[in-house]
Amino acid sequence: MSTKHSKAAAEFLKNKKQAAWHDETLWLVRAKRDRLSKEVPEWEELRNMACATKLYSNSHLDQLLVEFENNARANGAHVYWAKDADEYCNIVYNILNQHGVKHFIKSKSMLAEECELNPFLESKGIEVVESDLGERILQLMHLKPSHIVLPAIHIKREQVGELFEREMGTEKGNFDPTYLTHAARKNLRQKFIHPEAAMTGANFAVASTGEIVVCTNEGNADMGTSQPKLQIAAFGMEKIVPDRESLGVFTRLLARSATGQPITTYTSHYRKPREGGELHIIIVDNGRSKILADPKHIKTLNCIRCGACMNTCPVYRRSGGYSYTYFIPGPIGINLGMLKAPLHYYDNVSACSLCYSCSFVCPAKVDLAEQIYLWRQDLDKLGKADRMKKVMSGGMEFMMNRPLIFNMALKWAPLVNGMPRFLIYNGLNDWGKGREMPKFAKESFNEMWKKGKVK
């Protein structure tokens, strides 16, 4: 089945060295995750608790979100509700516009990416500076993230070095990662000192305290919010957890699953506005309530955006993030894209081997592979099933329901072994594009059994 994904994957694989590096690097992250998880005896218990907590939270959103809002307001924060991406973007713009902000610093937020916040604000004349190193690199290169945790994983240090030569005046030909990191830090430091406002996403929102929690390894969220008096934070409504005790379960799982480290370098809790400042918090739906009403796919809301499913997925590792048409790639992106607009993102459904590795590593036990399988069953209902596959399946059904024809086909099948190669390996044989076809046995198992050759 030729899809946008398969064509983009073929382009990605043309650079064999880059493709191999991408595959190996992400597998190393998966291996680190395995080592760290084995050091925690109660790892599976934590996963079960995370899944149960998420299912509870998502089935009690009406209570927990209101509890969060009341506590956040009591803490001195302003709280807004956005039903979709347009409302979210306009709320952010109105806050910035009311304060006369023309440029601000922003930490990593997949919600902002989902709602295309940056292009919207830039169209209004507001400069957005990404403070996460990977996001900053991509911003300067005018590219989108290819991974939800490691956004620039597909970019080699030589490319970064050449970019910094143009944008920051670094030494020509110096591609040392430490040098490049220091150069980026020096460049960003100037942005941190005089921002008019700062914005963060949120990994978690705690209902019982009205606080948001942001996990970073670079400390960029803290740096960004340390100076300006105006802080904006936004999160998808599924990020809510009941209390700090529940939060502890997720912080133990998040970093181990995402990058194979015990905990992120910085776990920052934002509860109140700084003295003389303002804290504005936006709770976003943007289709999440629709997922909540879908019993087959409700577990998708369990996702904590750790990226473990991408690190382990053999298809993602070998095809790259840009081969997917939805802004989030990998197994979780396949499901989210189908929940968002199935007729637009259906081609991603084929980008899965159904090895179930994604389901096995998910810290919140999202049944990713099971859901992808369900989406495949729905392709025919959507009118998007592969026609050739349907014809072949129909032919197989016809033959399997007629023993005489089936046995005759088995008897004559070995003749194919002697056919010219071009008749077997052609455009109709997708399987043979990357594989050697197995030879047909001269004698079927059924015949051998009848003759007493096998017992």
Predicted regions span which residues?
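Intrinsic disorder at enzyme termini
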Residues: 1-26, 392-455
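Helix N-cap / loop-to-helix initiation motif
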Residues: 84, 309, 367-368
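Extended amphipathic alpha-helical segments enriched in small hydrophobics
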Residues: 306-310, 355
